[in-house]
UniProtKB/Swiss-Prot annotation:
Residues 1-28 form the signal peptide. The gene is MGF 110-5L. Keywords: Early protein, Signal. This is Protein MGF 110-5L. Disulfide bonds: none annotated.
Amino acid sequence: MLVIILGVIGLLANQVLGLPTQAGGHLRSTDNPPQEELGYWCTYMESCKFCWECAHGICKNKVNESMPLIIENSYLTSCEVSRWYNQCTYSEGNGHYHVMDCSDPVPHNRPHRLLMKIYEKEDL
């Protein structure tokens, strides 16, 4: 009972102080962000595996229709993303992190694009 009361007080305090709630503001580290947030996460780190739908070694970007089909290769990274207040973090799982201000995001696509192999029909 005490936990419920403290939870309600915490939510009310967040609303009064203008802080984001757990559902709307914070995101625990995950490799599967909410579908409605893919547009944000996949814009600033498009090499994350959760941004792509792959079948038979050919991948299509889930968010950006203008991205070419690619061959599933080392370009795709197993990312985990998290958000705490206004700090958004991408973890690439190999000790590399990209941290940015969520309201002033900075893309981190260039280093990974060098490894992208675009699908050509001759690749079949």
